[in-house]
Amino acid sequence: RIVMDRAVEVVSEKIQKKEKFLIPLANPRTLEQLVGFSLLLRDKKDKDSLVALNVINDDNDSLKQELQGKHSLERAAQIMTEADVEPKTVMRFDLNIATGIFHTAKEHDVTDIVIGLHHRKSIVDSFLGTLSENLLKKTCMQVMIARFHIPVTSLQCIIVAVPPKAEFECGFVKWISHLCRMSKHLDCQIHFYAHPQTSGYIRKYIRKKHRDINAVYTDLVSWEDLLILTGQMNYECLLVIVSARRGAISYDSSFEKLPGQISRYFNNNSVVLLFPEQNGEQQ
């Protein structure tokens, strides 16, 4: 336990390094929500921590895409400016959208990616979509895949489902800090559902670094009990599900059920699927 506590302290120190959030914008209808969400996650002291990106597929009607992308980036810049954040926007042409996002992330020293949950075009289409799946394979950084049904500023509570062994991931305290910032900005309660051991580390870190937030803890002994959260959710709550990439310490085969569970039981809720930062080299 002493070794684990020291590991959390080391990662806590690393989070003090410059953060940069990349926001790939593909759908004008979700633009304001994604930028608004990213604004809530950032450290307010950092005035240049957001990068809005539009990747244009060179293989299709690029002129139409370019006009739409330009409009989206202008709107994103406006939202950032209104929040007293230095607007940084990038338009990129690439045959592969995921590759375009990946290279932009490397060029701008990005630490986190915030992306919208794609709209399924057919029943054979995957829940996350090819783009998100490729990003998770190509990068080790934290990726947040978000879907909002109401404006982010209207959220009244944040419910976080945390899998067992999440404390062993190198991105553990990073996502806790991000969600605590969001809770503080919104002045709303954040409720963690986690295994007792994992919950202990969350409590300790929050007491040390974010003692001013309203945090509540409930034991979630088995990840199979995730569906009990359906009784805790309402339209004004955000559900954050902490997942993990294949091969990660906290990865569990039951994560494969998450797409179906979200679609069936949380379809009317605002949801963020969070993949913590991992150790390793970017591809």
PLM region spans:
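Charged helix-capping and loop-helix junction motifs
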Residues: 128-131, 254-259
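Structured cytosolic domains appended to multi-pass membrane proteins
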Residues: 13-232, 240-241, 247, 275
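Membrane-embedded transmembrane helical bundles of large multi-pass transporters/channels
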Residues: 246-247, 258
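N-terminal signal-anchor transmembrane helix
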Residues: 2-17
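C-terminal structured domain segments
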Residues: 249-251
